[in-house]
Amino acid sequence: MLKRTSKQLSMFSSLEDMLSHQHPLFQLSNKINWECFENAFSPLYCSTNGRPAHPIRLMCGLLILKHLRNVSDEMVVSQWSENAYYQYFCGGLEFMPKQPCDASELVHFRNRIGEEGMELILAESIRVNTDHDDEDHFDTAFIDSTVQEKNITYPTDAKLHKKIIKNVLKIVHDKSLPLRQSYTRTLKGIYRSQRFRNHPKNRKKALKADRQLRTIAGRLVRELERNLEGKKGYENMFELYYKVLSQNRKSKNKVYSLHEPDVVCISKGKEHKQYEFGNKVSILRSWSGLILGACSFRNEYDGHTIEKTLEQTQRMTGRKVDKLSGDRGYRGIKQIGQTKILIPDTPKTKDSYYQKRKKHKLFCKRAGIEPTIGHLKADHRLSRNFYKGVKGDAINVLLAAAAYNFKRAMRVLLYLIKRISIELVSTGFMLKYSF
């Protein structure tokens, strides 16, 4: 059930009067159309029963601030109680020296609005940057793919087998099931033998310990399956465990994590990081540096990600991209609908000098999407995804792209404020009357 939000100002102090109207976060909060979030997400709540929920603007604002400031759920809730600009951004009318909600409520809100709600936030971030703007952001765009790494440890068979044994023993202990042997003392020796496996003298011993660990894990799983009555609620768990125990080096569609079984292994040819474990994301950036699309995939060929990314951009903005430039990883596709796909290639003999220079400039400009991806990873939480499952993969990349666009709008607003102030001061107009 939605809680009624009061717009009654405080009799003694107003949060708006306390703050500087020149602050970029203050300016951004007045430029975002919060009513579109209210209208879109209100039907997701029950209007007749249940505890009154927190305001939609508060929850949306916290999600935006989290990726804008690159902090966790717990940290953004804690900072909200200390920062007056955060509270005004989330619709506060007076300063509240306490946390607005529990950090876990952000998890429920993300699951409630889903991927469609995140696309609405990204669409609003695009509108904030393009509203009343004469520049054509949809004439030429650039596309590139990167890996969004999942929050898992580096996967090895031994680590997975250890976790299987630990989980099985926990279920046996919680349900007081009979167990012929727990292998407690045996496992200590096996773990010791697996240490320092890279030393030439320990290699053979470590490989033998790996085989013993797999055997013990299989025994415990089979014994648990026999002792559990009906296996109700554990079917998926046993299926996952047997898949992990049966996979080898040449297996297809491997499981790299027990709590994130959808993670895939991607090799992008990097010297410092040969393999990355997560999922592939596609980023579409305009000529002016605005992110127009952000889609999540498994490990598809780059050329097969273009169509879905263009559809998302058209769905959010109602506009079509005329020309799309990508690197040589997108070879094989020349046109999708009305959008021409431009890939770097050997210059044609029939091209004039002007055409060659124009293409060269376009492909040089395409490289500008690389630092954009770098900022998404370093500043907006794209480098490591902490959200759960395939749904969390899509949510994280959409929120990171939206935060990037909102930060761009804040820089533009700050630049305009400084420029107007300098011009007014140069003409002799006092700065305190400027705003």
Regions found by a protein language model. Give the residues of each.
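Helix-centered, glycine/charged polyanion-binding patches within enzymatic domains
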Residues: 322-391
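Flexible, glycine/threonine-enriched loop-and-boundary segments that flank and lead into catalytic domains
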Residues: 258-273
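Basic, low-complexity intrinsically disordered segments
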Residues: 40, 45-52, 59-60, 67-134
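Charged, often Cys/His-bearing segments associated with DNA-binding zinc-finger transcription factors
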Residues: 1-32, 411-435
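Acidic, metal-coordinating catalytic cores used for nucleic-acid/nucleotide bond scission
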Residues: 49-54, 84, 325-333
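Electropositive, glycine- and tryptophan-enriched low-complexity nucleic-acid-binding patches
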Residues: 270-316
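Short, conserved catalytic/metal-binding motifs centered on acidic residues
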Residues: 23, 60-62, 76-77, 102-106, ...
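Active-site- or DNA-interface-adjacent structural scaffold in DNA-acting proteins
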Residues: 93-262
